[in-house]
């Protein structure tokens, strides 16, 4: 189970945690992923996807079909 958005492909970013004395240690900035059921009208069923919050906002504008086509995923596998 990867921490990656199903539609946008967003994943963790490598960054530094910087202390007051400016010592830097590596850390991960995880994407804000949410497990979400989305209605798929042409499939006439719910599809459970792991989406970033940015993808959820974009989904409301573009729609599931268009975003899945851009991402190159087959919704029948979800």
From Swiss-Prot:
GO terms for molecular function: structural constituent of ribosome. The keyword Ribonucleoprotein applies. Keywords: Ribonucleoprotein, Ribosomal protein. InterPro entries: Ribosomal_bL28 (IPR026569), Ribosomal_bL28/bL31-like_sf (IPR034704), Ribosomal_bL28_bact-type (IPR001383), Ribosomal_bL28_sf (IPR037147). GO terms for cellular component: ribonucleoprotein complex; ribosome. It holds the Pfam family Ribosomal_L28. GO terms for biological process: translation. The keyword Ribonucleoprotein applies. Belongs to the bacterial ribosomal protein bL28 family. This is Large ribosomal subunit protein bL28. It comes from Trichormus variabilis (strain ATCC 29413 / PCC 7937) (Anabaena variabilis).
């Amino acid at each position: 189970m990867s921490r990656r958005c199903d539609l946008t492909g967003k994943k963790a970013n490598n960054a530094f945690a910087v202390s007051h004395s400016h010592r830097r240690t590596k850390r991960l900035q995880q994407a804000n992923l949410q497990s979400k059921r989305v209605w798929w009208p042409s499939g006439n069923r719910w599809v459970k996807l792991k989406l970033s919050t940015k993808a959820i906002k974009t989904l409301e504008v573009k729609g599931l079909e268009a975003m899945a086509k851009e991402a190159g995923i087959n919704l029948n596998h979800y």
